[in-house]
């Protein structure tokens, strides 16, 4: 049995290691000022290379760096205007092409002190190819579904961290069991309780945390050189916040050693009901810990006006400590029992997120969402056309300017008297209050279902103007002062 000597430090209250992270692999050079960061003129949004950006995306897998046709998939995303991907550091052996991060020995066991070069080459390729295409990556370090045997998943059975699968420690030494059959949301796996001070922490877990930190340090040796990376600690975690806060501190310390700025957050499972979530409250109240707000779970279980209401609750609360609000997952496929909805629900959520003041919107992978399917491509193309006339950082949600509006019929973002973005979920007509404005406005229709331009029309200001969508289905209208079109 091979063992590693541990040196436990108390650099921070969370026990962050003193491990220095050097850029061992990546050679790309990025000016710190050009890295992804909140937009200097409106911190609700991001800027990249000094320019404001609206992050839009959709991809077919969550551990994106593992897919064999990655470069082609990124090219397709970029071709429709996408600039945002999600990447979990997962290695679930679901589809036959995934590999683990650690060196596998001839007897089939893993050595957690050695690396699988293929895994890290794939990750480096993702970093390099997205960098070349100006695509922003939102990385998730940990996914609770990677370590469960619930419902026949058997992911823990093949995990290198399972004591029976490696040469580095035993179950007795670490307190790790042979099987974990509980659903991940129950948060019973010791893997997520390795931080001193957590309620379920046991000193036996220190050895496991050593290897966790070694893995994250290796990841950062690749990613910190790139300026197109955001960091989210977990996928829909139900673990206590101390877990994610440890990893946020670990990443910040490593970035500080290299003199670069990074932006970190966590994703909480109960974000679908944010007004009742103590963890979301913590995230909102502590911008010094959570650099941006990741609210993806609001895009599940919530439909129509309820989705808008809960999203706007977050938007209003964030005004106390303004930061970007990201949606790296928008559900909308499969009609699951827990509320993913159908594809049209995903499209509506995507547009409510954009009109509602969010900094990013990405369709969840196939199976949970519509990924980069044609329906997603059309919405991304339509959103870019809208953005060509109405910059979302120049407007804010203003449904109060709409009259004769039915529930979930239409949503508005506006800078009154200057620019309006009006989204219809499925045809319909509403009154738009243009009183107090002067001159003419040009309305340009965009078909959400195809991503194509449609008709234009002129609107006279000074009163409430009735606007009717050209047909059934999703439509968005870009309404701007006529003199701004000249």
Regions from the language model: what does each represent?
Residues 28, 33-290, 303:
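Active-site mouth of glycoside hydrolases
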Residues 1-4:
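Positively charged n-region of N-terminal signal peptides that target proteins for export
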């Amino acid at each position: 049995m091979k063992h590693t000597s541990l040196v436990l430090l108390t650099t921070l209250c969370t026990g962050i290691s003193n491990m220095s992270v050097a850029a061992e692999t990546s050679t790309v050079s990025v000016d710190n000022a050009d890295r992804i960061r909140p937009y200097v003129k409106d911190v609700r949004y991001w800027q990249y290379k000094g320019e404001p950006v609206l992050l839009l995306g959709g991809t077919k897998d969550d551990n994106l760096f593992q897919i064999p046709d990655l470069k082609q998939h990124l090219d397709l995303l970029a071709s429709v205007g996408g600039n945002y991907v999600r990447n979990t550091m997962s290695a679930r052996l679901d589809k036959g092409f995934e590999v683990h991060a650690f060196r596998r020995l001839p007897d089939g066991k893993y050595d957690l002190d050695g690396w699988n070069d293929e895994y890290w080459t794939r990750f480096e390729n993702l970093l390099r190819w997205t960098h070349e295409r100006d695509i922003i990556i939102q990385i998730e370090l940990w996914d609770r579904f990677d370590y469960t045997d619930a419902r026949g998943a058997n992911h823990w059975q093949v995990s290198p961290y399972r004591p029976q699968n490696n040469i580095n420690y035993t179950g007795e030494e670490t307190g790790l069991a042979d099987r974990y059959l509980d659903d991940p949301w129950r948060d019973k796996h010791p893997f997520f309780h390795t931080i001193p001070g957590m309620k379920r922490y046991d000193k036996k877990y220190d050895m496991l945390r050593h290897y966790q930190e070694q893995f994250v340090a290796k990841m950062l040796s690749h990613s910190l050189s790139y300026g197109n990376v955001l960091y989210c600690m977990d996928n829909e975690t139900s673990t206590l916040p101390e877990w994610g806060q440890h990893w946020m501190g670990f990443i910040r310390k490593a970035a500080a050693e290299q003199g670069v700025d990074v932006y970190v957050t966590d994703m909480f499972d109960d974000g679908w009901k944010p007004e009742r979530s103590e963890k979301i409250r913590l995230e909102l109240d502590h911008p010094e810990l959570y650099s941006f707000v990741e609210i993806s779970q609001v895009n599940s279980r919530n439909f129509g006006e309820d989705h808008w209401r809960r999203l706007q609750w977050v938007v209003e609360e964030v005004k106390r400590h303004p930061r970007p609000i990201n949606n790296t997952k928008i559900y909308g496929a499969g009609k699951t029992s827990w509320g993913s909805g159908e594809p049209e629900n995903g499209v509506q959520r995507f547009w409510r997120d954009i009109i509602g003041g969010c900094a990013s919107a990405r369709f969840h992978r196939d199976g949970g969402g519509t990924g980069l399917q044609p329906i997603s491509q059309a919405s991304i193309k339509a959103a870019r056309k809208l953005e060509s006339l109405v910059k979302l950082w120049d407007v804010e949600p203003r449904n109060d300017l709409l009259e004769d509006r039915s529930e979930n019929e239409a949503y508005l973002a506006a800078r009154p008297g200057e620019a309006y973005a009006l989204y219809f979920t499925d045809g319909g007509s509403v009154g738009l209050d243009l009183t107090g404005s002067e001159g003419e406005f040009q309305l340009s229709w965009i078909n959400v279902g195809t991503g194509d331009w449609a008709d234009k029309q002129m609107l006279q200001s000074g009163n409430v103007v009735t606007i009717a969508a050209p047909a059934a289905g999703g439509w968005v209208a870009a309404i701007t002062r006529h003199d701004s079109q000249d």
